[in-house]
Curated annotation (Swiss-Prot):
GO terms for biological process: 'de novo' IMP biosynthetic process; one-carbon metabolic process. It comes from the Bacteria. The gene is purU. This is Formyltetrahydrofolate deformylase. The keyword Translocase does not apply. The active site is at D244. The lineage of its organism: Bacteria, Bacillati, Bacillota, Bacilli, Bacillales. CDD domains: ACT_F4HF-DF, FMT_core_Formyl-FH4-Hydrolase_C. PANTHER family: FORMYLTETRAHYDROFOLATE DEFORMYLASE, FORMYLTETRAHYDROFOLATE DEFORMYLASE 2, MITOCHONDRIAL. GO terms for molecular function: formyltetrahydrofolate deformylase activity. Residues 21-102 form the ACT domain. It comes from Bacillus subtilis (strain 168). Pfam families: ACT, Formyl_trans_N. Pathway: Purine metabolism; IMP biosynthesis via de novo pathway; formate from 10-formyl-5,6,7,8-tetrahydrofolate: step 1/1. Catalyzes the hydrolysis of 10-formyltetrahydrofolate (formyl-FH4) to formate and tetrahydrofolate (FH4). Belongs to the PurU family.
Amino acid sequence: MKSYMTQRLDEYRDGNEDKGRLLVSCPDQPGIVSAVSAFLFEHGANIIESNQYTTDPEGGRFFLRIEFDCAGIREKKSSLQAAFASVAEKFDMTWSLTLASELKRVAIFVSKELHCLHELIWEWQTGNLMAEIAVVISNHEEARELVERLNIPFHYMKANKDIRAEVEKKQLELLEQYDVDVIVLARYMQILTPDFVSAHPNRIINIHHSFLPAFIGANPYKRAYERGVKLIGATSHYVTNDLDEGPIIEQDIERVDHRDNAEALKNIGRTIERSVLARAVKWHLEDRVIVHENKTIVFN
């Protein structure tokens, strides 16, 4: 008998078996939308959602996300990709074609604080995050009971700076074993090495507990309290080798005042962190994010 979540994911796949997503980035010039639309029409596709943005109509960069229905797209995917290559070459495009029914496989990394993990699992169970949670990896045991109760593989891996390279080697092997597409750092309190980051470019999503670029690094709530801030926030971003400086996907804030001590700021911040991370992960799973330089275009 299939589990509740297996049934839910199968129903989503069946309901979206003909849905494709096309992401495009190229130098801005006349005729891009016309050429892409004509291509989709010629191949029997019907556009159901389209968003575009240009950094500058004259000499800027153009970005496009199209969601479309195309009967039998799973069988046609390879031929569509081959045929679209000529359009892409004409406009010097960077592009990707994905299927909504091909759910991304997610690995969640977590430490002792579980509020972000709880939020991701809740959003997943309610159908707001359509993905396969392939594995949860932690340097603490606190999450094991929650994760294994849902029949999600859980791996405890002790981690600190002295054994980081050794641990990351094992983690990378696990990610390959579970065929992971995206990694979510749900308050995973370890700094990743350049080797780890380079193995998954723009596929590691972090939540930082401050409104970046304020209070980069550790203990942001304590420093925010000492500074007497009137706003606190959270930032979800792709991980790069520059600590907390990767392309920002989503941010949010809430007002605070002098009556809020460091612990109160932390409690308020947890609520913001949960929702910000969940939105960022959702948009990545739905192919709504394009990275440009050190920024993102988010078609949400």
